[in-house]
């Protein structure tokens, strides 16, 4: 009897384990929702590093907590989802764009699906140039004013990788927050030229030159915004 009891207990345990695994072993989502944050179809150049977020809500479910998605510095995002109906929206107060016109986008995910997110930025960095002349870096750009009111500051960053933003730049960040200058360039078409920077005595700069990898990026920081709008990454060496 003891042997039969042990066998029965073992079989019961196996059945419980199998049942438990069956309940927990749901299929993983396989459809990819991808796209970019854009202005008139043009991808925005952003901070990256989880600074810009999108919220995705699935319709028809009791749980209303959003799926949080981070936007890369080139404006791209992606999320792995189940097929179904979703709502996509930017996070309020997050990103270098106006709240006006912020709206929910209805998305039907069926297999791999592409959906861009159109926004109205405060400013755009246009015709960005950064040049290296020996140990001196020069930088300039044009301003495109869209929904912005005032420019808080402008700056350029240098780094040894292509991932550069206001918080990640291992060579230098050069700010200009002169109020008079910011007022002068607060108009579409204005050209701004940074004061040339001499990096003869900058050890990280000299190391970057020896390694042959130096990248730069320019940023306009709108007044009142939680972050700036950027140029594309520029390779100087």
Description of each model-found segment:
Residues 93-122:
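Structured interaction patches on ligand/partner-binding surfaces of diverse proteins
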Residues 82-85, 190, 212:
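A glycine-anchored, Pro-Gly-centered beta-turn/N-cap motif
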Residues 16-20:
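C-terminal motif of bacterial Sec signal peptides marking the signal peptidase cleavage site
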Residues 196-228:
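Beta-strand-rich modules
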Residues 42-62, 149-155:
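Short, ordered, surface-exposed loop/turn motifs in non-cytosolic proteins
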Residues 59-74:
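Short, acidic Ser/Thr/Gly-rich low-complexity loop/linker segments typical of extracellular
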């Amino acid at each position: 009897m003891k042997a039969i009891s042990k066998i029965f207990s073992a079989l019961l345990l196996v059945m419980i384990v199998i049942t438990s695994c069956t309940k927990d072993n749901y299929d993983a989502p396989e459809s990819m929702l991808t796209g970019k944050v854009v202005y008139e179809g043009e991808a925005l150049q952003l901070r990256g590093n989880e600074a810009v977020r999108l919220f995705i809500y699935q319709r028809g479910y009791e749980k209303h907590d959003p799926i949080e998605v981070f936007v890369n510095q080139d404006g791209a995002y992606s999320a792995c989802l189940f097929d179904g109906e979703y709502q996509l929206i930017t996070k309020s107060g997050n990103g270098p764009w106006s709240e006006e016109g912020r709206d929910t986008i209805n998305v039907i995910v069926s297999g791999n699906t592409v959906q861009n997110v159109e926004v109205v930025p405060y400013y755009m960095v246009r015709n960005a140039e950064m040049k290296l002349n020996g140990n001196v870096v020069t930088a300039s750009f044009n301003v495109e004013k869209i929904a912005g009111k005032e420019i808080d500051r402008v700056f350029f960053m240098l780094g040894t990788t292509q991932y550069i933003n206001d918080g990640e730049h291992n060579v230098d960040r050069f700010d200009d927050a002169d109020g008079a200058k910011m007022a002068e360039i607060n108009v579409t078409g204005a050209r701004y030229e940074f004061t040339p920077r001499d990096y003869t005595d900058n050890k990280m700069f000299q190391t970057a030159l020896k390694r042959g990898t130096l990248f730069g990026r320019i940023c306009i920081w709108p007044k009142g915004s939680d972050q700036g709008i950027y140029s594309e990454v520029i390779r100087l060496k």
